[in-house]
A protein has these predicted regions:
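Periplasmic c-type cytochrome electron-transfer domains
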Residues: 8, 13-14, 25-397
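Short, Lys/Arg-enriched N-terminal segments with co-localized hydrophobic residues
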Residues: 1-8
Length: 397
């Protein structure tokens, strides 16, 4: 694990991010009125409007991704479609004119610009004029949408809510001319695909987590890894402090108080959350598990495996808002210590087959590794057959 003090020049980079946030505050009201904490629930929203926000709304973050990071220059000059796919960006096939892929040069950055003009690059939103990118920003879908690969790998129909475990956010950020210090490069290129550190620019600790699913959250009491607040809280935190959007975020426990006028984030949180809560966990593909073994595994799950004590049906997570200390589950404690709860939620198991690796840090490559971890840590004494059956049950959820 890399610590800020190990890399003095990282402080300079953190200043870049901090100044970007400070710029948001310049337009804020100065009347001293209290601001509602970002942990508070939001009112019901419109999921149809929320889908548009999830897919296409940058909340005004173009000034960071364009003016500060200069990513428009990088894309324009060096990111052809094959490079974009290699760093995990996805292409929405429904946005493409018929037959276009057979007519364009996938090694030419100009093709990427054309795809951006079509709104076909999932999670990127660009203003293109006469073949030149003028502004570029990012949306929620960058990390929390995948595609079904129905055209080819990385190109297909959108799968909103799926974690993009191919996306390499650190590698993408490392392309910015503003982030070329060797110490910063060492941090960003250490993350790897499917991992992002949402606290690094706040505390300087390098300890990335897996990009989580944004599906299957309806009825789940604790919606984030460390349970700081509802999904609207995390949406606001990420939008303002990570995407560097023009919005307000207030959490005194984290010591963050950012006010923006106009606030382009907070009014959209109800609709965004409403859409996310409509996204179901994906059912397992037909033939992907042994039904008889899964039935036996269900018995283990509720019996000797003791899994059901925390993973309570039908969502297969804690029924209440409980979080567990790392010592209860044998988890790495670093992320828990960086948040405000000091613990981790019980991860919902619906759709678990879809998003390996497992645990917040990706330390379990397979569901079998998950079972082995808890069998050893809790001293369950499961037989080889019981563990295999339990894996089949988990694959069936």
């Amino acid at each position: 694990m890399l610590i800020e003090e190990d890399f003095p020049m990282i402080r300079k980079t953190l200043v870049i991010f901090t100044l970007a946030l400070a710029a948001l505050v310049l337009g804020c009201d100065d009347d001293g009125d209290a601001v509602t904490t970002s942990r508070d629930p939001v009112p019901p929203g419109n999921p149809v409007a929320g889908r548009q926000i999830f897919r296409f709304d940058t909340f005004g973050n173009e000034r960071f991704w364009t003016d500060t990071l200069r990513m428009h220059e990088v894309i324009q000059s060096a990111v052809d479609p094959l490079t974009a796919l290699a760093v995990g960006l996805k292409v929405d096939a429904d946005a493409l004119p018929p037959g276009i892929l057979g007519q364009v040069d996938l090694t030419d950055p100009a093709t990427t610009v054309a795809l951006l003009e079509l709104d076909a690059v999932v999670g990127l939103k660009a203003e293109v004029e006469n073949g030149t990118i003028r502004r570029v920003g990012v949306t929620c879908a960058l990390c929390h949408s995948d595609v079904d690969d129905s055209v080819q790998e990385g190109i297909g129909r959108r799968l909103d809510g799926y974690p993009n475990r191919d996306l390499d956010p650190g590698r993408i950020l490392s392309l910015s001319p503003a982030l070329q210090d060797p110490a910063v490069q060492a941090v960003l290129t250490s993350w790897g695909p499917g991992r992002y550190d949402a606290y690094w620019n706040h505390d300087g600790v390098n300890d990335p987590s897996m990009i989580p699913p944004a599906y299957g959250l309806d009825g789940v009491a604790v919606e984030t890894f460390t349970g700081e607040g509802p999904v609207s809280y995390w949406n606001a935190y990420v939008a303002v402090t990570q995407m560097h959007s023009q919005g307000s975020f207030f959490d005194p426990e984290l010591g963050i108080d950012i006010r923006a006028t106009p606030d382009l984030v907070t009014p959209k949180l109800p609709d965004l959350q409403a859409y996310q809560l409509t996204l179901p966990a994906p059912a397992p593909p037909g033939g992907s598990f042994d039904a008889e073994a899964a039935a036996r595994g269900q018995v283990v799950f509720g019996g000797q495996g003791t899994c059901a004590g925390c993973h309570t049906p039908p969502t297969f997570t804690d029924a209440g808002e409980r979080v567990h200390s790392p010592s209860e589950t044998g988890m790495d404690p670093v992320l828990a210590g960086r948040g405000t709860t000091g613990g981790y939620r019980t991860t919902p198991l619906r759709g678990a087959w879809q998003h390996p690796p497992y645990f917040h840090d990706g330390s379990a490559a397979t569901l079998g590794d998950v079972v082995e971890h808890y069998d050893a840590f809790l001293g369950l004494g499961l037989s080889v057959q019981q563990k295999a059956d339990l894996v089949e049950f988990l694959k069936s959820l």
